[in-house]
Amino acid sequence: MKCDICPRECKLNNDVSAVGFCGFSLIEREKEIKLARAALHFYEEPCISGQNGSGAVFFSGCNLRCVFCQNHNIANCKVGKAVSIERLADIFLELQEKKAHNINLVTPSHYAYQIINAIKLARGKGLNIPIVYNTSAYDSVETLKALEGYVDVYLPDYKYADSKLAGELSRAENYPDKAIEAIREMIHQVGMPVVENGIIKSGVIIRHLVLPGNVRNSKAVIDRLVSEFGTDITLSIMNQYTPIEGLELPGELGRTVTEREYNKVLDYAFDKGLVNGFFQDGETCKESFIPAFDYEGV
């Protein structure tokens, strides 16, 4: 049996011991959803966080699991509390009651179909704020098609244009092409960002995290995005890379991105005609910007 929810296409059977790359078996995902946190979050792009905060729901497990992941404790399933689909729907409603501008699903890909059911339940009980799908973009196009009508805002990364680098850091040599296919489907569904009173209501914002020592990859990312989608896209270029103590990090990933590296990438984006987007200042590369995965709101 093959799990085709993402491009990994893990070969699994119905045994609970048959665990996919994301960290879970098919049976586990059918029975329960594991969460690490569900709370107002203020460190997204301004049009997502706004003044009230984004209702961020952090899912345990990940289908990409980059070696440098700042959320490695949840990506590797070290943290996670099991909840039902009914409880997840109630969490969405509780975040809405706290005046969240949106429901922000963080690393949701491996739970896509359970999330659809939770959104259905929550909307039946009055959920009416946008749903944000905050993903690595290592998503199956077929899974994304199932999400159409349930997701208002897609927030995909485009991490690598270099397949060799994608293999070294995420064990996903096909990431550059698969992520482009996924982003194309996202744009097809919801288009470019629609912002009202400073808050995004629908559309796609593409993110790229600049990695230390990898300016060339970042430039190639910009080239690929412009080639595929033109210069009207909204691109959020991030410098918040934070080396986590205790992780074995290859190459120059043991340090933060220099101001010179980051400015080179920004200048390149401007030179390529990209004018819609976001950039960060140097204060973002701190562990204090990484949430505490303490089961708040779960």
Residue ranges and their predicted role:
Residues 167-197:
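Anionic-ligand binding region
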Residues 24-149, 153, 162-164:
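Conserved Radical SAM active-site core
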Residues 75, 112, 137-140, 158-176, ...:
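Conserved radical SAM core fold
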Residues 118-130, 181-189, 259-265:
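Alpha-helix-loop-beta-strand connector modules within alpha/beta enzyme cores
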Residues 83, 110, 170-178, 213, ...:
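Alpha-helix N-cap and loop-to-helix initiation/capping positions
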Residues 148-163, 232-241:
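Non-cysteine beta-strand/loop elements that form the S-adenosyl-L-methionine
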Residues 1-18, 187, 191-298:
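Auxiliary Fe-S-binding modules of radical SAM enzymes
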Residues 55, 103, 131-133, 154-156, ...:
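Hydrophobic faces of well-ordered beta-strands that scaffold small-molecule active sites
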